[in-house]
Design a protein with these regions (language model features):
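Short beta-strand micro-motifs in enzyme catalytic cores
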Residues: 11, 35, 83-87
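A short coil-to-beta-strand element that immediately follows conserved catalytic motifs
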Residues: 64-73
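Active-site-adjacent beta-strand/loop module that shapes the phosphate/pyrophosphate-binding cleft
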Residues: 75-97, 108, 129-134
Length: 139
């Protein structure tokens, strides 16, 4: 893929949602590389901020209403080559469920041990550091 083609593809915004000592994970029907369990995420639409995209994608995929708290950062994904932004979000209302059965196979709140099993290589370092802190705060 050319650099020009990569630049024209929309970036991806991922929501990092921790509530009651658990992180919201989704299992995609189609794996991206070795990943099947991941954070709720999707493309940033024209005119949308990464925060808005993370909030929208979480609602579309899981039915959960969240609010953006802060952007942890961004990187070029080593497998997909797409720009990823990671946004900490707070759960506001609703119950997480499988709202997008075409794209997802499962939605789950995972504790730190389950995260280690489902994502054995961990997340990008700033995301993993945030999760380690947020999940250890509850034990």
């Amino acid at each position: 893929m050319t650099a020009e083609a990569t630049e024209k593809r929309p970036g991806i915004a991922a929501a990092v949602v921790v509530d009651n000592g658990r992180v919201l994970l989704v299992r995609r029907r189609v794996k991206e590389g070795s990943l099947s369990w991941q954070l709720p995420a999707g493309g940033v639409e024209d005119g949308e901020t990464v925060e808005q995209a993370a909030v929208r994608e979480t609602k579309e995929e899981t039915g959960l209403t969240v609010s953006a708290v802060k952007v942890l950062g961004g990187r070029l994904h080593p497998i997909t080559g797409r720009h990823m932004s990671y946004v900490v979000c707070a759960a506001e209302s609703g119950t997480a469920h499988l709202a997008d059965a075409d794209e997802l196979a499962e939605v789950e709140w995972s504790d730190r041990n389950e995260v280690a099993e489902r994502v054995p290589d961990g997340f990008w370092e700033p995301v993993q550091a945030y999760l380690d802190s947020a999940l250890s705060a509850r034990g």
